[in-house]
Every structure is written in structure tokens, then in C-alpha cells.
Curated annotation (Swiss-Prot):
Residues 563-637 are annotated as: C. It is found in: Cytoplasm. PANTHER family: HEAT SHOCK PROTEIN 90 FAMILY MEMBER. Pfam families: HATPase_c_3 (PF13589), HSP90 (PF00183). GO terms for cellular component: cytoplasm. CDD domains: HATPase_Hsp90-like. Molecular chaperone. Has ATPase activity. This is Chaperone protein HtpG. Coiled coil: none annotated. Residues 1-345 are annotated as: A. It comes from Shewanella baltica (strain OS185). Signal peptide: none annotated.
């Protein structure tokens, strides 16, 4: 009895289909790669389920994908004998996009074909790519272990809805028929399909077959009869696990196609590493660094991790236990000989084999990046632009590899005069002044704010390089990266500059003299500002600016306070240390003021100017403007 229902597509699916139907892609043949890849995944999933329930094979354990075309009807059919789908599964998988953050993704689409094509490629369209070439798609599927009369028919023309009906299907698995649009009929040509399949399916580990027509009996050149042959399904690919083949036998093109198969990315990977590990643990890993960051890199619900195989049998996607979070951009797989075939995510969590493999794979990825940075600085900058902020999570997460991760970090610097983060900590150390023991840095809201900060004045004058940090994660990073190669990282906005041997005896003497001469001025300012500051000092870091504020040693920095406030965390009250530059004309004139009320106003004005320069904002900007206007009026009389 028919149980036909009509369902509306999820809003995001409608948007995606609109893009598919209106030919977003110049490379339309990718639909076949996506559908064959899905079919191969279905075979892998059945093989895994059958480990504990052999009856799911239903007497047919030869898993394969078959592709056929009917030129007269203008159809292409992709059929597998994999795990199949139930009615509920069909409605879920072929009517919605089960990805968190999907709505935000579609907001990012610009309407510009080239940009949107790249974004959609990062998003991954899977089954919906069928509508790039098809005016109508028909799916017939039966889930393994279900009765023949529990099969499902799904149909849609890619507009606003789809129909689902119950049918009878003798064989398990899924059969997808594409009814090609008139202008896409070339894909029903046998030779065209064969060329695409040969190009895209060699790396797939299940056989991909095409129908080869039989030939009638004919006469040979010498008059002998050539017997007729029957039509048969012919395997078009090598049908072996690519990662088990020798590296010498795999071309770059095959590696790139395999990357696209497992990642559903449309662009080539930046680099890869293929290794077999033998010893206490035996496993093979094939790891890829993508060229582009995924659109949902910062989504907390995003799944990441490697594909896990055990003795060539697919076990699970997104096995995050083998890769630390700061390397979540890495794609690839791991095939273990030591884990049990019935391994679960829970078993992986507290498994000594897993931990040893994670350690080895992490070192492998860091080694890949170190080699790239050494051999191809330009390509490494391309990597850094995409994934640098993620890598900065590493020192906090991975203490054992902290030094190696730190060596991979890149920063802007006063040495280059550019906002581009191209300077490594090793570069900085190689340029350190004689007698310099610290790596100086500043964290600010923007590169401009960092580069123009008054805290850099003395260091610039002395030619001492300062790393300029302005990404949100930098303050978090620096809290967990306090030294590198026995050189302490020191903030120029916190406590004393601690120049050590970089400050000669005459400079120290001049500083001490200035501090002694300014004792009375410092005390007057302290009295005027009262409890708004922790302390008032004569600066050792300013040359051209009248005053600045600094955080005390061990106190929370301005940037960390902002991070905590943005995260909704309670922040303790932090009072700044106010540093004055008595050599500046404004401060020297302030010292001459006899009117204590005017002195207090000017002191407050200088403090708020310094806070504005440091924080980029004030707690009460209206009061600051009112005070400044009052001072301007007083001086215009």
C-alpha cells in the first residue's frame, strides 16, 4: 500500500539547491565524484556494522558501486549495495543539512559566483550536487536488515519539496537516478562517464563498476569466427586502499583526489604526509594540511578528527582522540593494526595505544609544518594566514610540544614595519642586541594601536625590536608562553622594562636623578588622583609622550580584562600604575601650576588620555569630554 508523503526542504537546503540549479560550478562533473564517494562510504559503513551482525550482508558480501547511463532517456544511475537508508533516514539526510552554523554560512554568501563557489566547496554539498546537472532526482533505497517491502522511493525536482513513498526493493543499498537537463546530456555518454570515473575513483577502496556491452559473433581477418561475448560489469578502479599502497606508486594527482574524497573539499591540499609506523604500535597515517580553512573552523559544535580504520575496515569518522584541538584543521586517516575492530569512542578515550598514536601523529604534523616553514616560507605564510590563530592555542593545550609550537608562530614586528605576521621567535632572537635577555612584545586591539603605542618610544630609540600582537587570542597565548629558548617574553606595558645591560650607567644615573627631582610632583599627582590609580611613577619608557598607564607585575593586563568581559566573566577591579614623563613640556608646566584645583584637572586629563591610548575606550567618555572642554575654555580666555 502506497504511503506517499510530500515534505518541504529545510530553508538552507532550498538556498543550496537554488545555487546548484543555477549552475554555480564551471566544473560540473564533480557531482559524480560526490555521489560515488557517498556510495563508497555506504559500503564502508555496512562492512563495519556486519562485523557484529553478519546477517546484514544478506548473502551478498561483495560490496561495490555500479554506474550506468541511458543515453535515450538521458539518465545516469549510481547504485551501491551498502548500508542503505530507512524512511526516516531518507527524510533526515535528503531533506535537511545536519550541520551546526548552517544559517550563518548562507549569510556569508555574496552573490558573486567565484567567491560563493569557493565557499560552497568548503561547506560540502554531497548528495545535493546531483542538481548541478539533473532536473529531477529519483532515489530508491532499502536499509540493510530491513524487509524488501520496507524500501523507500524519494523524488524531487529540486524546487521547494520532495516526495517519499514506500516501495518494494529486492536488494539492499541505494540507487540514485539523475534525469539530466537537456544541456547536460553529455554525461549520459558512455565515454564521458568512463573518463570521469577513471579520474575520480582510483583511490576508492571498493570496486566501481560500469556496464560493458557484449559483442555479437563476427568474422576475423583470416575468416575465423570470433565468438560473441556477453555484457558484463567491469571494474574501473584499482579498488585497493590507497594508503596501503607504496608511496612510490602514488602520484600527486592521486593523493589530491583522495584528499577531496575524504574531506569533500573542492580545492587541492597544501601538503600531505604518508607514513607507515612499525614498532610497539603498527599503523599507517595519511595526513593532509588543507589550503583553506573550513567555513566553520571556530564553531564549537564542529566535528573534527581523523577517519579511523582498523585493519583496512572503516570504523568511524571524526576520531578526535588522535589529534589535539589546536591541530583540528588536519584532515586524513589512520589505519591501526593494534586496536580491536569493535573499538568505540569511549574505548579510544582512555587507551594507551590511542595515546601513543596521538603523540606520534602530533609530532608528525608539527614536523610537516617545521619542514614547510624551513623550505618554503611563502607557502608557510599561506598556511599561517588560514590557520595561524588556531595554532596559537597550542602552547596552552600541549605542554610537551610547547617549544616546537612556539617556533612555528609568526608575529608582526617593529623590525619589518609591516602588519604582516612574518617574524618567528627565532628570527627575533637572531637580531637581539648584545646584552639583551628578553623578548619584548606588546598586545593591543589593532596593529596600528600596537605599532603607535607610546610604550615603544624608548625601545624604538634604542633600536630594540618589539613583537606587535593584535589578535584576540594573543593575550591568551602569551599567558601560556612565558619563555622561548630560555629567553623570557616580556610585555612593554607591564611593570618595569627591565632593560638590564641595554641601559648604560649614564642613563641609569640620569633616570635616578630625574626621579629624585620629581618626588614632589609625583606626590602632588598621587594626592590629586587619589584612589583612581595604584601608584604614580616617573617613566623610564617614554620619550615623546607626557604619560602612560601600565599594569603591575602579576596583575591582569588590559587585553585579558577585555577578553574576560567579552566572555561574560567577572573581572576584579584593577587600578593602573600612572607613569609620567617630567621631560615633556605638558608635565613640566603642570609642575609649575599653583592652583591645586587646576592641577587636579590637568592630572586627570593626562590620566584619561593615557587610558584612552592604552584601552581604546574610557569608562565615562562623557566626563572626559566635559573636562577637556572645560580646560579648553579656561585656556581660551
Amino acid at each position: 500500500m502506497s504511503q506517499q508523503e510530500t515534505h518541504g526542504f529545510q530553508t538552507e537546503v532550498k538556498q543550496l539547491l537554488h545555487l546548484m540549479i543555477h549552475s554555480l560550478y564551471s566544473n560540473k562533473e564533480i557531482f559524480l565524484r560526490e555521489l560515488v564517494s557517498n556510495a563508497a562510504d555506504a559500503a564502508d559503513k555496512l562492512r563495519y556494522l556486519a562485523l557484529t551482525n553478519d546477517a546484514l550482508y544478506e548473502g551478498d558480501g561483495e560490496l561495490r558501486v555500479r554506474i550506468s547511463a541511458d543515453k535515450e532517456k538521458g539518465t545516469v544511475t549510481i547504485e551501491d549495495n551498502g548500508v542503505g537508508m530507512t524512511r526516516d533516514g531518507v527524510i533526515e539526510h535528503l531533506g535537511t543539512i545536519a550541520k551546526s552554523g548552517t544559517a550563518d554560512f548562507f549569510k556569508n554568501l555574496s552573490g558573486e559566483s567565484s567567491k560563493d563557489s569557493q565557499l560552497i566547496g568548503q561547506f560540502g554539498v554531497g548528495f545535493y550536487s546531483a542538481f548541478i546537472v539533473a532536473k529531477k532526482v529519483t532515489v530508491r533505497t532499502r536499509a540493510a536488515g530491513h524487509k524488501a517491502d520496507e524500501a523507500v522511493l524519494w523524488e524531487s525536482e529540486g524546487e521547494g519539496n520532495f516526495t517519499v513513498d514506500t516501495i518494494t526493493k529486492a536488494s539492499r543499498g541505494t540507487e540514485i537516478t539523475l534525469h539530466l537537463r537537456d544541456e547536460e546530456k553529455e554525461f549520459a555518454d558512455d565515454w564521458r562517464l568512463r573518463s570521469i570515473i577513471t579520474k575520480y575513483s582510483d583511490h576508492i577502496s571498493v570496486p566501481v563498476e560500469m556496464w560493458q556491452e557484449g559483442t555479437p559473433e563476427s568474422d576475423g581477418a583470416d575468416g575465423e569466427k570470433i565468438p560473441a561475448t556477453e555484457g558484463q560489469w567491469k571494474v574501473m578502479n584499482k579498488a585497493t586502499a590507497l594508503w596501503m599502497r607504496s608511496k612510490a606508486d602514488i602520484s600527486d594527482e592521486e593523493y589530491q583526489e583522495f584528499y577531496k574524497h575524504i574531506s569533500h573539499d573542492y580545492t587541492d591540499a597544501l601538503l600531505w604526509s604518508h607514513n607507515r609506523v612499525e614498532g610497539k604500535q603498527e599503523y599507517t597515517n595519511l595526513l593532509y594540511i588543507p589550503a583553506k580553512a573550513p567555513w566553520d573552523m571556530w564553531n564549537r559544535d564542529r566535528k573534527h578528527g581523523l577517519k579511523l580504520f582498523v585493519q583496512r575496515v572503516f570504523i568511524m569518522d571524526d576520531a578526535e582522540q588522535f589529534m589535539p584541538s589546536y591541530l583540528r584543521f588536519v584532515q586524513g586517516l589512520i589505519d591501526s593494526n593494534d586496536l580491536p575492530l569493535n573499538v568505540s569512542r569511549e574505548i579510544l578515550q582512555d587507551n594507551h595505544v590511542t595515546k601513543a598514536m596521538r603523540t606520534g601523529i602530533t609530532k608528525r604534523v608539527l614536523g610537516m609544518l617545521e619542514k614547510l616553514a624551513k623550505d618554503d616560507a611563502e607557502k608557510y605564510q599561506q598556511f599561517w594566514a588560514e590557520f595561524g590563530q588556531v595554532l596559537k592555542e597550542g602552547p596552552a593545550e600541549d605542554f610537551a610540544n610547547r617549544e616546537r609550537i612556539a617556533g612555528l608562530l609568526r608575529f608582526a614586528s617593529t623590525h619589518t614595519g609591516s602588519a604582516a605576521p612574518t617574524v618567528s621567535l627565532d628570527d627575533y632572537i637572531s637580531r637581539m642586541k648584545e646584552g639583551q635577555t628578553k623578548i619584548y612584545y606588546i598586545v593591543a586591539d589593532s596593529h596600528e594601536a600596537a605599532a603607535n603605542s607610546p610604550h615603544l618610544e624608548l625601545l624604538r630609540k634604542k633600536g630594540i625590536e618589539v613583537l606587535l600582537m593584535s589578535e584576540r587570542i594573543d593575550e591568551w597565548l602569551i599567558n601560556h608562553l612565558t619563555e622561548y629558548k630560555e629567553k623570557q617574553l616580556h610585555s612593554v606595558t607591564r611593570g618595569d622594562l627591565e632593560l638590564g645591560e641595554l641601559e648604560d650607567a649614564s642613563e641609569k644615573e640620569a633616570q635616578e636623578k630625574l626621579e629624585q627631582e620629581s618626588v614632589a610632583l609625583v606626590e602632588r599627582i598621587k594626592a590629586a588622583l587619589g584612589s583612581t590609580v595604584a601608584d604614580v611613577k616617573v617613566t623610564s619608557r617614554l620619550t615623546d609622550t607626557p604619560a602612560c598607564v601600565v599594569a603591575g607585575e602579576g596583575e591582569m593586563s588590559t587585553q585579558m580584562i577585555k577578553l574576560m568581559q567579552a566572555a561574560g566573566q567577572p573581572v576584579p577591579e584593577v587600578k593602573p600604575t600612572f607613569e609620567i614623563n617630567p621631560a615633556h613640556p605638558l608635565v613640566s608646566r603642570l609642575n609649575d601650576l599653583q592652583d591645586e584645583a587646576a592641577f587636579a584637572d590637568w592630572s586627570n586629563l593626562l590620566l584619561q588620555q593615557a587610558q584612552l591610548s592604552e584601552k581604546g575606550s574610557l569608562a565615562d567618555p562623557s566626563a572626559f569630554i566635559k573636562l577637556m572642554n572645560q580646560m579648553l575654555l579656561a585656556n581660551m580666555k
